[in-house]
Amino acid sequence: MCIRDSGISFLIFWVEEVWPASRLKYNRVELNGQVSTGWPPNGFNLSNQSIGADNLSVKKISDTDGVLAVWNQEGNFSDVYAQKIGWDGEAQWESNGTPISIEENDQSAISFDIDENGSSAFIVWEDYRNGSDYDIIGLEIDLSSGPTGSEIYFSSDTTNQQKPLVKSVAAGEYIIIWEDGRGYYNSDPLLINGVDLYGSAYVVGFGKTTGVDGIPISVEYHDQKKPAITKYSGEDHLLHWIDLRSSGKEDLANYYAKIIRRSDVLSSTNEKANVTIPSSFNIQSVYPNPFNGQVKFDFTINSPQLVQFNVYDISGRTIVDEIIMSGSKGYHQVSWDGKNV
């Protein structure tokens, strides 16, 4: 893989399969394919060269700060390591990478993202340290200094929670989605036989925005799997996944999606010292009433959190099913124009 800097050079990363272990290396090349002047012909070592490493992922931090690399390395089975690398090729953290998780058994299926300011990153993975089932665990990364604080448990259910996805949706705000094995044990026979999607969020300076085990994102018959999040419009993002709810005698895969919106902050403690912060969730009357082009929903929250936003018609049919990311406590607002009916 390669990451381009602000000019015409590229940092390239590769797996070198040399007995007794595969190892990770990197170098810089110019647009003409030649190794940059002064850089070693055989590249720099990224991982410990004496033990195996794989599942490398690299993302650009900024035009000035270089890149962040995250990978699996053999240790207590499969561990998670990371390294910040400047555009000059210098590793910013400890040699061979800084350990993110070196617990017993496997830590795998790594996902990470960097916020829009390039000041923080968040790494999540599926974790088998208890030896009986997989949980989703994450860790905040301060890109100026390295890992911060303690690991964050997003799940602790006795079923398997696996294949996490993390996406930065604003400065210091991250959405986390995963495949959840509770779908195999639903009490409703119409909703069993496959993994469901659950989710949470993480806000730098606050923490995770839901209780342990998250909130349901899509709980339907058969599998809801392979989630992805892409930029949609403005501050909105589109969460989309493969969905097998229509399966019968044979599996039938469709594509489903829902919008992740960010609410407008009407007031918070960051704006006025005399604002009274609510102690619980509350929604106000919708206005204007009757409907006049667009209606607004005002609500209050006492902490950053994910809010389920649903609109129903008079027959009870769901016509809006969205997730609202509210990144601060206080008074918030979302609007709806009825155009998606």
Spans of features found by a protein language model:
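Extracellular, repeat-based ectodomains that mediate carbohydrate processing or recognition
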Residues: 4-266
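Low-complexity, Pro/Thr/Ser/Gly/Ala-rich linker/spacer regions in secreted
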Residues: 261-277
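C-terminal outer-membrane/trafficking sorting elements
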Residues: 272-341
